Regions:
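Non-catalytic accessory regions flanking glycosidase/transglycosidase catalytic cores in CAZymes
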Residues: 21-203, 212, 230-267, 271-285, ...
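Catalytic metal-binding/acid-base residues of hydrolase active sites
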Residues: 210-211, 257, 300, 304-305, ...
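Bacterial N-terminal signal peptides that target proteins for export
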Residues: 1-7
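Bacterial N-terminal signal peptides
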Residues: 7-16
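Catalytic-core region of carbohydrate-active enzymes that cleave or remodel glycosidic bonds
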Residues: 303-373
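Short, flexible/disordered intra-domain loops and linkers
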Residues: 217-224, 263-274, 346-354
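The feature captures the catalytic groove of carbohydrate-active enzymes
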Residues: 203-225
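Alpha-helix capping and helix-loop boundary segments enriched in small/acidic/polar residues
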Residues: 173-180, 221-230, 311, 352-356
Length: 373
């Protein structure tokens, strides 16, 4: 209702101005009713991939400046905000492609990560130091919520011995006998980072973009597909591990790469589609997670590939909201950036320091909040 009233008021203002000076526009008055909230914004966050493993090893002065820009809620001496005040920080738990070097088949070192787990089954808590530095810098500036996510299981557990899906199909790059080991690894990482760095991961997502076609076709970065059944199996095992250890970290699903996969199938089959229904409709007996301990009734998705044209931007988010409401599921939009299909601003290559890209991203955020939120 409030959105409709605002649209009418703005249209009326435009018409009044078009009528010339003889018809002055009436005064408009807006009232913010803080006692009548229509939405709850839980977090304003960002991710450390694929940069903080490099930037986190820069000179401390530069790290501090970047951290201020990202996390600070303070003002400088002139009253200007020091930063954008992120409230949540996503940490990419690595799979070990950095240690493999060129043998990882991932061309860019920026797209590789270290792994805490070693080949002999022990842990090296000196790994991923750059990213961990930014965990600490975030906490020092008031960030209280942290989410860990994984693009791939550790290379010691994968079927092809890599952190990328090269040469495989659309199933999880995880050995059948390693599902329980993977769950223990995830729990060990949550406990290990809290013990060594004083950072608690409030949330963890075992699979990042398991429906994304990008991680099935070639070695661009760490990544593994997974079917809904494979995701559900992993989440149930991790839930059991958390319960046994009395851990309250919440397990998130599914960090979808495309809203269309949450609603139906898109560039895949039913095994990786209809995700809202698969995980939160009790009739989906093989994949239902609605009664699984440590799993909130919440879906995570990424705002890629449905950002243009403008009519699609809105329509897709309205459809998403309808499906979420049908199954009484909350929603977090947990990742976005400019991609190749964003042709209106020239695609995702190079740099743009003008307001053009900033306004385009703001439009995406607005539609995610207003129509999908």
């Amino acid at each position: 209702m409030n959105y409709k009233l605002l649209s009418v008021a703005l249209a009326f203002l435009y018409i009044g101005m078009a009528g010339g000076c003889s018809q002055p526009a009436p005064d408009l008055r807006y009232q913010i009713e803080v006692d009548k909230p229509l939405q709850t914004m839980e977090h304003f966050g960002a991710s450390d991939a694929w940069s903080m493993h490099i930037l986190g090893l820069w000179p401390q002065e530069k790290q501090n400046q970047i951290a201020d820009w990202l996390f600070s809620t303070e003002n400088d001496a002139n009253g200007k905000p020091k930063g954008i005040g992120l409230s949540l920080w996503r940490f990419n738990v690595g799979a070990g492609s950095t240690e493999q070097g060129e043998a990882s088949q991932i061309g860019s070192s920026w797209m590789r990560t270290e792994c805490f787990l070693q080949a002999d089954g022990t842990y090296d808590w000196n790994k991923q130091q750059g990213q961990r530095n930014f965990l600490k810098l975030a906490k020092e500036r008031g960030v209280t919520k942290f989410l860990a996510f994984l693009n791939s299981p550790p290379v010691y557990y994968t079927q092809n011995g890599l952190a990328t899906n090269t040469g495989r199909g659309g199933t999880a790059n995880l050995k059948p006998e390693c599902y329980e080991k993977y769950a223990r690894f995830l729990a060990d990482v949550v406990e290990g980072i809290e013990k060594h760095d004083g950072i608690k991961f409030n949330y963890i997502c075992p699979f990042n973009e398991p429906d994304g076609h990008w991680n099935w076709v070639g070695p661009k970065q760490e990544g593994s597909p997974a079917t809904n059944r494979e995701v559900a199996r992993t989440v149930r095992l991790l839930s059991r591990e958390f319960v046994n250890r009395k851990m309250d970290t919440q397990i998130m699903v599914n960090e979808s790469s495309d809203y269309r996969c949450m609603l139906r199938t898109h560039q895949t089959d039913w095994q990786r589609g209809y995700q809202i229904q698969a995980f939160f409709c009790p009739d989906s007996v093989d994949t239902y997670l609605g009664d699984t301990p440590n799993v909130p009734r919440l879906m995570l998705g990424h705002s890629y590939w449905t950002t243009t044209p403008l009519s699609e931007l809105r329509a897709m988010r309205c459809q998403l909201r309808e499906a979420l409401d049908k199954y009484n599921v909350g929603f977090w939009q947990s990742e976005t950036c400019i991609m190749g299909n964003d042709e209106e601003i020239g695609g995702g290559h190079g740099f743009d320091r003008t307001m053009k890209t900033a306004l385009y991203v703001a439009r995406i955020i607005h539609h995610d909040i207003v129509y999908a939120g």
